[in-house]
Amino acid sequence: MTRRRPERRRDLLGLLGETPVDLSQANDIRALPVNELKVGSTQPRRSFDLERLSELAESIRAHGVLQPLLVRSVDGQYEIVAGERRWRAAQLAGLAEVPVVVRQLSNEQARAAALIENLQRDNLNVIDEVDGKLELIALTLGLEREEARKRLMQLLRAVPGDEHEQLDQVFRSMGETWRTFAKNKLRILNWPQPVLEALRAGLPLTLGSVVASAPPERQAELLKLAQNGASRSQLLQALQTPSQTSAVTPEHFAKVLSSKRFLSGLDTPTREALDRWLARMPERVRQAIDEQS
């Protein structure tokens, strides 16, 4: 059984409820040299868009860093908790110092603050959003990621209690409910890996949904169409036409007709029509089916 951590969870919820991500009005802002800061171990960002980083650097060069970085002291160094993108852009802009607010934060609190800032990005893709919110849920409930995922689905059916209130508080700050997240977005993590990678690269969720719900043998074809600019209606239309990517072989028919999943999904009239066709099918197809059996 997973051991819960109620005291640490209260500390985390206090951070979420009382420490704003917008630190521009803090009364203890100070300046630190950029070379005295290091990337935080709790940062959720995987990469930075160089073009957007350059644009931010130009803005900083003209107006300065308007939003202080949130940092903490770790082993005699200052570690960035929130604001790594501004720190990198400030270096590109040639700044020697950046404004910071220093807080004493645990690893768990620092991770939560970094996640919250990351989730407020304008260009956040849906996979980073789902990953970040699931990790925030795990921190809130004091569970590992996969355990939190299972627990979230259990809470949808459970009588409201302490955990419901904690999740309500966390998601309220993000303008969403955890129930909506659990019902509509959490399932995305079950989609095929190529679709997840495409979503992370910017593919719209509406297109990814069509690809993920298509038969496995059509997904690569549809994903390529989506990445080349096809609309949702065009993907749905393509799904209604036979695949043009490869010739249909007797072996392919045999594989489909030998699939229990395929056969169990047929209604009675379709199954009867298939039986009639099988009674007069070509010998080459019959041999292929026998080989698949």
From Swiss-Prot:
Gene3D superfamilies: 1.10.10.2830, 3.90.1530.30. This is Probable chromosome 2-partitioning protein ParB. Belongs to the ParB family. GO terms for cellular component: chromosome. The keyword RNA-binding does not apply. Signal peptide: none annotated. InterPro entries: Chromosome_partition/occlusion (IPR050336), ParB/RepB/Spo0J (IPR004437), ParB/Sulfiredoxin_dom (IPR003115), ParB/Sulfiredoxin_sf (IPR036086). GO terms for biological process: chromosome segregation. Pfam families: ParBc. One of its GO terms (molecular function) is DNA binding. Keywords: Chromosome partition, DNA-binding. Involved in chromosome partition. Localize to both poles of the predivisional cell following completion of DNA replication. Binds to the DNA origin of replication.
